[in-house]
């Protein structure tokens, strides 16, 4: 019987364990710093075992990695390197759902010598977006066509009927990772020209996009497209954009939160006996009580907004103008924001999230005709059960793990889905049995 370690028991881990335990009948070791979290993922299933482990370096993982056949790391992205180093020592492959870490890529040659695979970007976005892109590219090329413009979008949002807060967002994945992504710069290509967007300009660089059959959203660029150009075999004159989708209003909300300093995660502060009102006034260099002007007015002036601007009302809804002590006593400004958001922007048990993965490719064909090819996946979460995001992230990496164990993926070294073009077809076929299907459409022009 195959044995798998799932390292990390965050919001995405349960569907991974469910698939490997119930569909594959594999033995699972769930590992987390807090054993209660690992138990929540494993449950009382006889093939599962929960273990508590504090991971300070790669050697802490050796007893577990040495015991299993393969490892799935669901840890925060920077920690994958510890897992990879332990896997190298023991000759075990590792899969993750995160963007590929340069430190792990640097181990590719050693992994090849050991005959093992480091397979990253096996989640929803990144992951399913790559597979949808590869699927359309293969179809276009199979008909003699050439892609000239690619747009790929992904998101996890409240389902339409549960988009019931003024921020237009709720947390279905770890908020620390959410804000790390919110500060990461991006780059895309417009007819071969590289457009770079720094992290502090990300939310100014948005536009509206209509997703066929679903609705209108804001999109802003998602990470750097550069490495995907070669992996997808794209020409230098391509237009290629990867973006995230959000409900309208989101980007300005995030922009202004950043501009008043709430994304600061570096400086620790003492919030003992500090009210939200005082804290918010201090963000814009004011005193909450020294004159007649309210903090709301001071924030609006700082941002050059009207006092009735949507953002001021949303900041008020989050509680930042309340005259009561801050709930956390010590932390960073970002910690204060996270605390308020998690209390106001979490899903109720009956509420549903939704994921959307949408790819649009404009193609030219030898007869001079042109087409826009669309592939769209949309799925809602299950009330009182798994979120759509947890399943869209967890199922691809779980299915990929089974494929590696069964010898259906024979690659070694460091890879992501675009560098393994034979991966997506069988994976998407099985994913369809779980309800995750790309709907395709062709628009001639």
Descriptions of predicted regions:
Residues 55-67:
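Conserved Rossmann-fold cofactor-binding substructure of NAD(P)-dependent oxidoreductases
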Residues 86-104:
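ADP-ribose/adenylate-binding Rossmann-like module
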Residues 45-58:
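Rossmann-fold cofactor-recognition segment
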Residues 98-120:
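Rossmann-fold NAD(P)-binding glycine/threonine-rich loop
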Residues 34-37, 101:
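Helix N-cap at the beta1-alpha1 junction of Rossmann-like dinucleotide-binding domains, i.e.
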Residues 4-8:
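Conserved N-terminal Rossmann-fold NAD(P)-binding element of oxidoreductases
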Residues 13-14:
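N-terminal Rossmann-fold NAD(P) dinucleotide-binding loop
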Residues 139-445:
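C-terminal catalytic/substrate-binding lobe primarily of soluble NAD(P)-dependent oxidoreductases
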């Amino acid at each position: 019987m195959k044995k798998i370690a799932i390292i990390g028991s965050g919001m995405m881990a349960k569907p991974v364990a469910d698939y490997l335990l119930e569909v594959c009948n594999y033995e699972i070791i769930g590992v987390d710093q807090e054993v209660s979290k690992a138990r929540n993922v494993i449950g009382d299933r006889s093939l599962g075992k929960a273990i508590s482990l504090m991971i300070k370096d790669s050697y802490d993982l050796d007893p577990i990695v040495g015991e299993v056949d393969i490892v799935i790391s669901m840890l925060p992205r920077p920690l994958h390197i510890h897992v990879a180093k332990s896997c190298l020592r023991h000759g075990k492959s590792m899969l993750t759902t995160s963007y590929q870490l340069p430190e792990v890529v640097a181990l590719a040659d050693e992994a090849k010598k050991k005959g093992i695979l480091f397979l990253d970007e096996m989640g929803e976005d990144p992951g399913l977006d790559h597979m949808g892109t590869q699927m359309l590219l293969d179809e276009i090329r199979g008909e003699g066509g050439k892609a000239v413009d690619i747009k790929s979008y992904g998101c996890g949002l409240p389902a339409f009927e549960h988009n019931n807060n003024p921020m237009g967002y709720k947390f279905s994945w770890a908020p620390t990772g959410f804000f790390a992504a919110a500060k990461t710069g991006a780059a895309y290509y417009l007819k071969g020209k590289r457009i770079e967007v720094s992290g502090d300009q990300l939310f100014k660089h948005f536009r509206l996009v209509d997703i066929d059959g679903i609705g209108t959203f804001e999109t802003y660029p998602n990470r750097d497209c550069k490495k995907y150009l070669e992996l997808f075999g794209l020409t230098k004159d391509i237009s290629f954009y990867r973006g995230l989708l959000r409900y309208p209003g989101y980007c300005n909300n995030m922009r202004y939160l950043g501009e008043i300093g709430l994304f600061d995660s570096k400086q620790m502060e003492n919030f003992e006996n500090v009210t939200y009102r005082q804290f918010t006034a201090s963000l814009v260099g004011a005193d909450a009580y020294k004159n007649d002007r309210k903090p709301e007015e001071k924030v609006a002036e700082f941002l050059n907004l009207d006092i009735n601007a949507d953002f001021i009302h949303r900041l008020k809804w989050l509680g930042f103008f309340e005259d009561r002590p801050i709930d956390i006593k010590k932390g960073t400004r970002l910690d204060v924001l996270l605390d308020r958001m998690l209390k106001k922007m979490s899903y109720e048990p009956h509420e549903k999230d939704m994921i959307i993965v949408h790819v649009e490719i404009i193609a030219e064909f030898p007869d001079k005709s042109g087409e826009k090819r669309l592939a769209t996946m949309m799925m809602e979460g299950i009330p009182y059960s798994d979120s759509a995001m947890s399943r869209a992230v967890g199922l691809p990496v779980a299915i990929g793990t089974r494929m590696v164990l069964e010898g259906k993926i024979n690659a070694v070294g460091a890879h992501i889905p675009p560098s393994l073009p034979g991966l997506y077809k069988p994976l998407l076929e099985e994913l369809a049995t779980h309800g995750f299907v790309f709907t395709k459409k062709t628009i001639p022009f």
